[in-house]
Amino acid sequence: MSGTHKKLGARHKARKRAVDFLFEAEARDLDPVDLATERAELSGKDDSVAPVAPYTVTVVTGVAENLDRLDEVISSHLQDWTLERLPAVDRAILRIAVWELFHATDVPPVVAVDEAVELAKQLSTDESPGFVNGILGQVVLVAPQVRSAAAATSRRAETADGESNDARS
């Protein structure tokens, strides 16, 4: 990135808002999906509340639904650290990026990593961008296999649903 400010796209802003919601939910011991949904509803009624992009809700929901697996993957790539020791904002950034790497098929892996590093630069410590990049550099190597397995599982579930619907007919 050059010395000029990079124009931030809608997805970047949505990811940043997702980090905010995940961070706030963890700090306040709230359900992140409820928090994002309530803010989205409130923003429709109150102009003083910033709008919540649909992608923000998608990301927060995806992270919440897959939290245990995401944390397991992140933890497996930490060396001499535990997930709990990471700054909360770094946890939120990593969770979003790993969710995108594994589940957001419309997001190229390089974009998920670059966005996470950019968010770490904006929101966290001086060491965080390199740390986030290092962890995601390892995770990105297994992402294609995880995506393939998820797609196969989804296809099997759809086939099973179709067969059970046929049996009821």
From Swiss-Prot:
GO cellular component: cytosol
UniProt cross-references to InterPro entries, sorted A to Z: NusB-like_sf (IPR035926), NusB_fam (IPR011605), NusB_RsmB_TIM44 (IPR006027)
CDD domains: Terminator_NusB (cd00619)
MF term (GO), any: RNA binding
Alphabetic keyword roster: RNA-binding, Transcription, Transcription antitermination, Transcription regulation
Biological process according to GO: DNA-templated transcription termination; transcription antitermination
Main function: Involved in transcription antitermination. Required for transcription of ribosomal RNA (rRNA) genes. Binds specifically to the boxA antiterminator sequence of the ribosomal RNA (rrn) operons.
Family indicated by similarity: Belongs to the NusB family.
Xref: PANTHER family: ANTITERMINATION NUSB DOMAIN-CONTAINING PROTEIN (PTHR11078:SF3), N UTILIZATION SUBSTANCE PROTEIN B-RELATED (PTHR11078)
Protein name in the entry: Transcription antitermination protein NusB
